Amino acid sequence: MPTINQLIRKERQKVVKKSKSPALVSCPQRRGVCTRVYTTTPKKPNSALRKVAKVRLTSGFEVISYIMGEGHNLQEHSIVLVRGGRIKDLPGVKYHIVRGALDTAGVANRTVSRSKYGTKRPKVKK
């Protein structure tokens, strides 16, 4: 515990909050261009082929972002919208690609949680 004199000489330092998505530079989303689209495998207890893309953002950063949902239409030079949010079992993947925005198509035949996957409301058959 510091004395009053010690506090007068050197005040307490504020705790600086570190951003979990520094490449977005305090923006909610950023536009970017896909430089590589590929699949990768998750960490130990899980097993899959997760779809990811390396994206060069308008902020100048190059990040790895996750393509969520079943199936996608992304390839090299696709323009995408990137948001924050990490994937726990993929090391180094701290961003998501927004489905249904710019060149990214929404998930086809999706009926539940459609807004997260950029899918329009299906036509009701009478």
UniProtKB/Swiss-Prot annotation:
**What GO terms fall under cellular component here?**
small ribosomal subunit
Which biological process annotations from GO are given for this protein?
translation
Keyword Lyase applies:
no
Q: Which CDD domains match?
A: Ribosomal_S12
Keyword RNA-binding listed: yes
One GO MF annotation is: rRNA binding
Which positions bear 3-methylthioaspartic acid?
D89
Read off the Pfam families from this record.
Answer: Ribosom_S12_S23
- Alphabetized UniProt keyword annotations: Methylation, Ribonucleoprotein, Ribosomal protein, RNA-binding, rRNA-binding, tRNA-binding
Assembly: Part of the 30S ribosomal subunit. Contacts proteins S8 and S17. May interact with IF1 in the 30S initiation complex.
Similarity field: Belongs to the universal ribosomal protein uS12 family.
Q: What does this protein do?
A: With S4 and S5 plays an important role in translational accuracy.
Identify this protein by name. Answer: Small ribosomal subunit protein uS12
